[in-house]
From Swiss-Prot:
Belongs to the bacterial ribosomal protein bL21 family. Part of the 50S ribosomal subunit. Contacts protein L20. This protein binds to 23S rRNA in the presence of protein L20. Keywords: Ribonucleoprotein, Ribosomal protein, RNA-binding, rRNA-binding. Pfam families: Ribosomal_L21p (PF00829). It comes from the Bacteria. Disulfide bonds: none annotated. GO terms for cellular component: cytoplasm; ribonucleoprotein complex; ribosome. Signal peptide: none annotated. This is Large ribosomal subunit protein bL21. NCBIfam families: L21. It comes from Heliobacterium modesticaldum (strain ATCC 51547 / Ice1).
Length: 103
């Protein structure tokens, strides 16, 4: 059984027990978050596709941890003008585990 969900403006294909990193959620570690933006659910070989979402379907995610991703460097410069700007960024994420898919 799998589902396609949306959280943080991105879509994920999830199964029960999967661990994934999503955009930061406002929840504490140990909390259970309910996602109702479910676009498709497959159960026993039968695929239900929503228009745009599947009615009554939801996915329960358990928050395990919060963190920051790998640092990326933004470097801007203009040749011959002595203009240089260096900036770093680390994207915040939430690590979640899929507890249940309810369809």
């Amino acid at each position: 059984m799998f589902a396609i969900i949306e959280t943080g403006g991105k879509q994920y294909k999830v199964q029960q027990g999967d661990v994934l990193k999503v955009e930061k959620l406002e929840a504490n570690p140990g909390d259970v978050v309910e996602i109702d933006r479910v676009f498709a659910v497959s159960k026993d070989g039968e695929l239900k596709v929503g228009a745009p979402t599947v009615e009554g379907a939801k996915v329960l995610l358990k928050v395990e941890d919060h963190g920051k991703g790998k640092k990326i460097i933004i470097f801007k410069y203009k040749p011959k003008k002595n203009y240089r700007r260096k900036q770093g960024h680390r994207q915040a994420f939430t690590q979640v585990r899929v507890e249940a898919i309810q369809a």
